[in-house]
Amino acid sequence: MDSSIISRRAFYRSIRNEDFTKTKFSQIVPDREGLYLKKKVFLGYTDISAAGSRALLGISVKTISCDLDIPELGTSELICHPSTVTMDIPLLPIQIMHLNDAIIFKFSLIVINTSLPPSKCHLVADKIVNLCSESEIERLVVLTTIKLRIPEKKLAPLYENTFNTRALTTSPSLPDDTKVHDAFLNVLIQMVQLQGIPCNMMIAPGHGAFSSVPTVDDNSLQAIRAFHQFIGGWTRLKFDEKVCLSLEFGRSKKIRRAGTLFMFS
């Protein structure tokens, strides 16, 4: 057997056994054989405000980052960049971060920090859902922001819709007839249901992100804090808010998502 294959297997076996005693604060592992997810997975992506991805990039424990390369996407540019702080976590267009901590080692974070063309969203969703299935995860938690047609005074700070699992919070769920104008989320929801992946959708009200750091005006600041409050209440994960709030959304135009409308039913 090829010795390189043996070494790769040994490397990933050491990751599964949480053998991180000599690991730096953050380390990049190339995308190659052996990609996997731990039992509980958080996913944040570039939706209308990129609040979920910015919330996760502030993780304040040691991580190992894996480049989730999808050749069909071609060259991908980063959407969010740190504006005022130096980050220990490397920024990649699509990455998996395994938490390197003896107490919270069962978590992986997936961050999509690039804009996905509507015609390519199914490629990314398929890769992620297949990884979830192959890794036999216990739960996928998706952090997303949606522009909701609900009067401002009646908006909740966070909603939760579940698929194939129980709720994690007492937050209200969005009605079954809620329309979602988000190509990636549409495809992800369908694939999650098709493959029976236990999934919790944590949804914060949102608007198109400004070309700036998170602000109250586009609701990205409130969404990031709502996500952190939820995660902190369910897990022992901690985040550096200064890092999250320094991540500048790098597009001059608001993101628009094409795609079929999908209901939460």
Predicted regions and their residues:
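Functionally constrained cores in energy, signaling, and assembly domains
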Residues: K39-K40, F107-S108, R139, E160, ...
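Flexible, glycine/charged-enriched surface loops at secondary-structure junctions
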Residues: C199, G233-S252
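Generic recognition of well-structured, leucine-rich alpha-helical segments
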Residues: S135-E138, Q195, W234
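Short secondary-structure junctions
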Residues: S60-E72, P172-D176, L237-E241
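N-terminal catalytic or cofactor-binding beta/alpha core of small enzyme domains
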Residues: M1-R139, T145-K147, L155, S252-R256, ...
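Conserved, well-structured core segments that form the ligand-binding/active-site neighborhood
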Residues: R9-S26, M191, Q195-G196, N219-F227, ...
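Catalytic cores of processing enzymes, dominated by hydrolases/peptidases
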Residues: K147-G232, R256-F264
